[in-house]
């Protein structure tokens, strides 16, 4: 904990300059958090699209032996493989892009921490133990949300696909409309999961941003 200094003894010009530096770095940090959260939610969407395709392809593969085979089976296989490969490439490209964004965010966090530490003990009476953990908590949230979401999405899709297959086998009616309805239900379930995951992620990121705004507003006045 740094020694507190009487505000009356602070050089106003020096204080103004230091606050300006802090605010400029805060603006950069806030922008990076926004961009990173956008990238992460984009990856969540792409990841769930890939997983939905994989899930629907597994479902298709499991039930196609019970349906009259035709040329459309081979065409469907080719389309599914092509789209899946393209989306997987897109997913991993965005994952590495997000990791790069998180690395930049970490760099700004360290730089801002250094700036704040220079202010500690000089004039603003900011304490490292009170300030820094909030930023690194936000960084950790952004870094760990995507893997958790993908694991959750993969597990959910496996269960949904398995249950869908069991329902089709139980009904035992090789009806294309039934398969189509099952696929639509699968997409609706995935869309619901996607909505809830994105909402949860956005709320968490916004909560961290609100904490940062509140803290900075109180400390630099």
Curated annotation (Swiss-Prot):
It is a multi-pass membrane protein. GO terms for cellular component: plasma membrane. Keywords: Cell membrane, Membrane, Transmembrane, Transmembrane helix. Its main location: membrane. The chain crosses the membrane at residues 41-63, 78-100, 141-163, 178-200. It is found in: Cell membrane. This is Uncharacterized protein AF_2214. The lineage of its organism: Archaea, Methanobacteriati, Methanobacteriota, Archaeoglobi, Archaeoglobales.
